[in-house]
Amino acid sequence: MKTTRREFLKMAGALAALPPAGFAWAGQAQPKSASLAAAWRGPNAGDTYFAGVLSADWEGKKITISRAAALPTRPHGLTPEADGSLLVTGVRPGAWLMRIERDGKVAQQVDLAGESSDARLNGHVVVSPRGDVIYTTETDMKTGRGLIGVRDRQSLKKLAEWQSHGLEPHQLLVDAAGHLMIANGGIPRTAADKKYDLHRMDASLVRLDGQSGRLLRRWTLDDPRLSLRHLAWSHWAKGDKTFLGVAMQAEHDDPSARAAAPILAVLDSDELILPARAGDGAGYAGDIAPAYNGGFALSSNQVGLAQLWHPAMPEKLTRIVELQEAYALTGWEGPNPGGGVLVSTALGLVRWHPSAKPALLPWPEKMAVDNHWVLLDEA
């Protein structure tokens, strides 16, 4: 199955609606390939999940599976390490954490059932700036408290637990000062991962000291039914600003309120704002990535859509990809000066870029790529 000419024209024509950014359009050398850390399964819900590396050949117009390791259950977050290995976590409530080596072999696996804590993983990991520890988002399954696990980088053994100062911490990143930025999703969940008592939602964005876990700052939104989930940094050179984008999911009881809900929050300096009140018609952003040099791309898999936000047009979301199951996102530099994004869809990998032609590469076999992927390198 191939995408239509109309859909490609939408991807290319989206630039007309974006603010001018001074891009050069011709005569630039384009990368020939890209490697992505990804997770996937076969076409059926019961198929085995794998994590590994997908290689995109732009000139050959194909994707190959460079390495793959079978996983015990569905994964969620993927974190590349400097030596080429890959940290993979089980989907919430995650019972395992795994390291996969460059050759695709499983080097380590931690089963949380064997730890003394009652915590389970919430899906994301980040490596400390010093490289000695990793931080994991977790939930105490007895109390429901949000936790940050501090684990030895080499052994993956838990060294300490910090409070996340909220419910259901999901993704976390490190800021320029080495502190942790954590999206507390705020949704009460049972041990079987069922949502309940949504009137008690307590979503927040917090900053913790990266050495001690001390709470430095906590931000909340006026609407308590907006769950803060995924994070990305993006630098806007023209405005000399770095933004933290937060992809959100609406949990309102009223379907019309969910459909009308915004899907993006932005930490601008020290203020958490909702710049674009328009959303996606579903109130569900699945992933976020830096794009267009200072902006963010957001995916909405429920409606088959990826949209672009930029600080030069802060009230607007521009559609850049409209394909079924538009989901995993990662920033892609591409030709100078960068600003592109790679999007997983039901049909294959979609490439969007301000100065490169859009492209769609079909999957190498029948497969369903999971929620997130990460660009490793391009050549």
Regions found by a protein language model. Name each.
Residues M1-K2, E7-Q28:
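N-terminal export signals
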Residues W40-P43, T137-D140, I182-M201, V246-A259:
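Short, conserved, GDST-rich strand-edge loop motifs in beta-rich repeat architectures
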Residues A51-L54, I148-D152, R200-G210, A260-D268:
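Beta-propeller blade signature
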Residues A68-E81, S85-V127:
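Blade-loop segments of beta-propeller domains
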Residues A68-P72, L112-S117, W162-H165, W219-P224, ...:
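Surface loop/turn motifs at the tips and blade-to-blade linkers of beta-strand repeat domains
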Residues T73-T79, A119-H124, L167-L173, L226-A232, ...:
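Repeated scaffold domains used in trafficking and secretory/extracellular systems
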Residues E81-D83, P129-R130, D175-A177, H235-D240, ...:
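Residue-level detector of Asp-centered blade-edge/turn motifs that repeat once per structural unit
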Residues L112-H124, T136-D175:
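Asp-box/WD-like beta-propeller blade repeats and closely related beta-sheet repeat scaffolds
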